[in-house]
């Protein structure tokens, strides 16, 4: 099962490396990883997407909590949360394809952010399944390049990740 783990970590040299090393040393897979500063300049927030049984996820959170730089760990998938990911996709858009690509972008509430004679670059946001559905819906042969940020997540309602 997919889990989104939010980690508050001290902004220190090598902290990210130790977290990634922990996953690597224990054979855990990281599907995506995002890191950004928080409202507190001394802390960063990591969002780690990984898969595993409940026992594996419990072990991951225990190991993360043992790292000195880690301030707090929350498995967002244990409660209600909002997940978003950004995808930029460059597609061939020539002739009849232009209108079809524009229509598909509109259906998925994407934005065309760059236009050339032969291509569109489309920006899409949503959960991973929405972005995957867009990729399935368009002709694979028209995809020139794709980049995705990986998931970011936040608890819903009063649920917050703070020290």
What is the meaning of each model-derived region?
Residues 1-45, 49-163:
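Long, contiguous binding/interaction regions
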